[in-house]
Amino acid sequence: MPAMQLVAIRQFLGGILYVAYFLFQKTPWPKAKQWKTILILSLLNFVLSNGLSTWGVKYISSGLGAILGAIFPIWIVIITFFRGERLSKLAVTGMLVCFGGVCIIFYDHLKDFLEPNFTFGIILSLIATLTWAFGTLYTKKKAASFNPYFSLGLQMLISSLFLFIVIGATGTTIPLSEIPANSWWSIGY
């Protein structure tokens, strides 16, 4: 099953469930100015981060994927530093120790960084973690004024529509009837 189609279906179904729950609870819709934030977060956290991450792991080993995913907090430190904000030395040390721990656990996969066949997957995964970091920082800055879970559902729904457009335009889909059972189980999970 095409990875982006899997992501689009998973986010669509998850978004529908979240949004339906909050509509049933009569949660007020976000205000007009909040939709810009929701749209930006949809693109950063779901279309780019989740979509590119899922696409990227098709081209790399799982251990390398774990190492690349663990780079996410380091991006936070780097971005925060260049914004002129301060992080405590303890926080930075903790992130580096955790990243080092992941590298120790997946030590055998460090050599995969040198594998030419993995270059595309590495690039996709790095962009995914970088957009995840920007999305996280943007969430911290902008998203506190409305229900984060309702926003999450809307982000999932909006991002799935973007992804359906992309996979439709690129022809990277298969009919729903041809999706294997294990893919449906992973979507449900």
Outline where the language-model segments fall:
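Transmembrane alpha-helical segments that form core, pore/gating elements
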Residues: 3, 18, 76-82, 95, ...
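Specific alpha-helical transmembrane segments that line the substrate/conduction pathway
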Residues: 5-16, 45, 50-89, 128
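Membrane-interface helix-cap regions at the ends of transmembrane helices
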Residues: 13-31, 100-115, 158-183
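Hydrophobic transmembrane alpha-helices of multi-pass small-molecule transport proteins
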Residues: 18, 39, 71, 87-109, ...
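Residues that mark transmembrane-helix kinks and helix-interface sites
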Residues: 19, 50-54, 74-77, 106, ...
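Specific transmembrane alpha-helical segments of multi-pass solute transporters/efflux pumps
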Residues: 19-69, 104, 185
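Cytoplasmic-side transmembrane-helix entry/capping segments in multi-pass membrane proteins
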Residues: 33-42, 87-100, 121-122, 146-156
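Residue-level signature of transmembrane alpha-helical cores of multipass secondary-active transporters
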Residues: 38-42, 54, 66, 95, ...
